[in-house]
């Protein structure tokens, strides 16, 4: 559920699920004495087409290791674990056209990121054992817990870093989701590449924009192309008029590879420059915000309730 332009999120996945409906998956694997996660088996479609069956706790370790820096605070890692578990349990109650023989896959444009423990250890170097144990503790300490709205698993979308507030889901994907509303997000001081700049040469800007919006009038001075910027709930760009045509901030982000829709824009003969803050689609939980809240002393369930409005954090067993 990561954002393929930068951080992680659900975008098209959420819309596909909303449009297609779901079917229950019949599965029964119970071993007395196991943890709640250990009793649940997850079928994972790997990139080579193999379907691997793992206990939920082993799968979650691989997801969290891929999705969040292991150097983060323990409570932030726990919040990420619950978000990952919630997403997985929700997927287990559905069939997905992209991988009908598996509950989830390892394609981040469809499901969650995934890394093999050996690869994670290689990435972590001398910290491998510490980080391995740290993520295992995050999984064990939240065993069986999920983020629920009206008793059902939520779409626990997340992203890397916000520009001070998260974005309401309806502004990004067109679906009003009661627990995915705009909230304040303290990001802390250590966010990498929090501010970024993208300058697009005029010819490239014209070519890409007119391919999508042929009615736009890009004659005259470039500084005069832009007008009527409408902010979204996070203070970023909901829409802006370019050459007399209304263009969504998300469309500009996709067209020009911007890290978020929180940007300002300037134009001259040298090109169009976007000054961007944050990273990701902006909906749901900010990972760096979660880490900042953990540093303030908030627990994982407090972090989840901060970002997902009106939810409960409680045990959940998938409906098979």
Predicted regions and their residues:
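Acidic, low-complexity proline/glycine-rich segments
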Residues: 40-59
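N-terminal, intrinsically disordered, polar/charged segments of Gram-positive cell-envelope systems
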Residues: 18-44
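Acidic/histidine-rich, surface-exposed loop or edge segments in extracytoplasmic proteins
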Residues: 55-73, 184-192
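Soluble non-cytosolic domains of exported or imported proteins
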Residues: 50-54, 71-82, 199-200, 280-284, ...
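Extended substrate/cofactor- or partner-recognition/assembly subdomains adjacent to catalytic sites
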Residues: 86, 90-272, 277-278
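C-terminal soluble interaction/assembly domains
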Residues: 248-320
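Single conserved hydrophobic/aromatic residue that forms the stacking wall/gate
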Residues: 1-14
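Sec-exported extracytoplasmic/periplasmic mature domains
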Residues: 65-69, 82-94, 210-214, 294-298, ...
